[in-house]
């Protein structure tokens, strides 16, 4: 019987296995940031261990950095300590670090792919749940905890149980105003936040094939929000074109050899998945979250659910709780709902394609006087490219704040936060209670919907303004 792409990746990286323990797999790339690495390095030092493969370990600063200045001193005390520790640890263990003054600095899941560090066939780990983003390149990529960070630093290996396999087929030509963000929110709405628990999900189908690498990364980034271990998309011509000539991508003869290998990274025709799901997304509309988890999503023209019409007591109580936190009423329309802030950024939607499509919406327009809007490029290279194209001027002239790279308002771990009661149109990946700031209310949307909300000061049906 044939193998799925996940099985090929997993099996080819097993370096030890017996019936009494979990298999041990080799890790090809280990990405670090300032938040989940300090304890791991401290433990290494206490045990007088070295980093096994510094050449396969790369670090950047992203989670708690200020996006207003590239000075560490602009962040809080705890953040300053974490960043300084990362500098010291990378120096002590000879690890490449893209610090705040480095041209390659950025969000770890933006930096890795754009440097060509993320290559098909790899196993990739990082102390961050959205490491699944890299699966868009045909890699087995997943987040790990701090103790596992230490283990990979010390051994370049990890004990890892086999996951179940799921195939999600996505077909249909998207409407011109629909993005990958709408697609993945739609799927999470349909299946829920626990549907993928225990699975690695392979995405395939016409829609996936037509997406850019940026769109594919958005899909794999948010597979975690349906409970999956990771997401994978088989590499193809789109992947190869993106990777060619990137700094760490293979060159010359090595490129030819790599292509031959990469073209075999696909699920065999006779492979068996544990679960198969199919979606037709040709008719979907812009998606928006109304509640406090990504599955609490509706079409932007729809109304919020009414708890009285929900029979399941658990779902009913969850709906009541979410509506209360979000200060929304049952059956309330999302259209015309006023937003206080707009955030375009995060490892989900901060790449050059995201900034381009948002800039088209706001060009020659002005941000509503009642709304504060910020755009945070995912990396310095994204920022530089956007400025070459004049996108920064479009955003600034419209009234957006044009920031430096970082995770920013995706999470309340830096100085970009929501105040209590503020409502935000956000292109990030999580809308949990207090995620963007204590008492803040997050609505997950695409860059197009977010840009439109900034101009009007409230949510609109994008079809009506194109």
Swiss-Prot record:
Gene3D superfamilies: Aconitase, domain 3 (3.30.499.10). InterPro entries: 3-IsopropMal_deHydase_lsu, Acnase/IPM_dHydase_lsu_aba_1/3, Acoase/IPM_deHydtase_lsu_aba, Aconitase_4Fe-4S_BS, Aconitase_4Fe-4S_dom, IPM_dehydratase_rel_enz, IPMI_cat. GO terms for molecular function: 3-isopropylmalate dehydratase activity; 4 iron, 4 sulfur cluster binding; metal ion binding. Pathway: Amino-acid biosynthesis; L-leucine biosynthesis; L-leucine from 3-methyl-2-oxobutanoate: step 2/4. Binds 1 [4Fe-4S] cluster per subunit. Catalyzes the isomerization between 2-isopropylmalate and 3-isopropylmalate, via the formation of 2-isopropylmaleate. NCBIfam families: leuC (TIGR00170), PRK05478.1 (NF004016), PRK12466.1 (NF009116). This is 3-isopropylmalate dehydratase large subunit. It comes from Buchnera aphidicola subsp. Thelaxes suberi. The gene is leuC.
């Amino acid at each position: 019987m044939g193998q799925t792409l996940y099985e090929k990746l997993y099996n080819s990286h097993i370096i030890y296995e017996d019936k009494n323990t979990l298999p041990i797999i080799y890790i090809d790339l280990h990405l670090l940031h300032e938040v989940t690495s300090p304890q791991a390095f401290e433990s290494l030092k206490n045990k007088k261990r070295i980093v096994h493969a510094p050449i396969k370990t790369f670090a950047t600063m992203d989670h708690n950095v200020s996006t207003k200045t590239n000075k560490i001193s602009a962040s809080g005390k705890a953040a300053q300590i974490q960043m300084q520790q990362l500098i010291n640890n990378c120096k002590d263990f000879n690890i490449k670090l893209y610090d705040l003054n480095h041209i390659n600095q950025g969000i770890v899941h933006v930096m890795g792919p754009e440097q060509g560090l993320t290559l098909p066939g790899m196993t990739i780990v990082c102390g961050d749940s959205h490491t699944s983003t890299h699966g868009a390149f045909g890699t087995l990529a997943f987040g790990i905890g701090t103790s596992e960070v230490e283990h990979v630093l010390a051994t370049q290996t990890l004990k890892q149980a086999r996951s179940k396999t799921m195939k999600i087929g996505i077909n249909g030509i998207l409407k011109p105003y629909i993005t990958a963000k709408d697609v993945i929110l739609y799927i999470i709405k349909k299946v829920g936040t626990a549907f993928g628990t225990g699975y690695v999900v392979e995405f395939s189908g016409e829609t996936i094939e037509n997406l850019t690498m940026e769109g594919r990364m958005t899909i794999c980034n948010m597979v975690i929000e349906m409970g999956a271990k990771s997401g994978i998309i088989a590499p193809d011509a789109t992947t190869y074109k993106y990777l060619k000539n990137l700094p760490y991508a293979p060159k010359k003869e090595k490129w030819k050899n790599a292509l031959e290998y990469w073209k075999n990274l696909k699920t065999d025709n006779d492979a068996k998945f544990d679960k198969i799901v199919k979606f037709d997304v040709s008719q979907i509309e812009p998606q928006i979250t109304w509640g406090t988890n990504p599955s609490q999503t509706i079409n932007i023209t729809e109304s919020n659910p009414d708890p009285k019409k929900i029979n399941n007591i658990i779902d009913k109580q969850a709906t009541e709780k979410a509506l209360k936190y979000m200060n929304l009423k049952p059956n309330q329309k999302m259209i015309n709902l006023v937003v206080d802030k707009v955030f375009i950024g995060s490892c989900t939607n901060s790449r050059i394609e995201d900034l381009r499509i948002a800039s088209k919406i706001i060009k020659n327009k002005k941000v509503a006087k009642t709304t504060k809007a910020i755009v945070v490029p995912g990396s310095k290279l994204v920022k530089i490219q956007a400025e070459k194209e004049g996108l920064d001027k479009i955003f600034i002239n419209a009234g957006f704040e044009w920031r430096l790279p970082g995770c920013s308002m995706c999470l309340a771990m830096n100085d970009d936060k929501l105040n209590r009661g503020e409502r935000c149109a956000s292109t990030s990946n999580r809308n949990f209670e207090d995620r963007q700031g204590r008492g803040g209310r997050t609505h997950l949307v695409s860059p197009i919907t977010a840009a439109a909300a900034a101009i009007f000061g409230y949510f609109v049906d994008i079809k009506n303004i194109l």
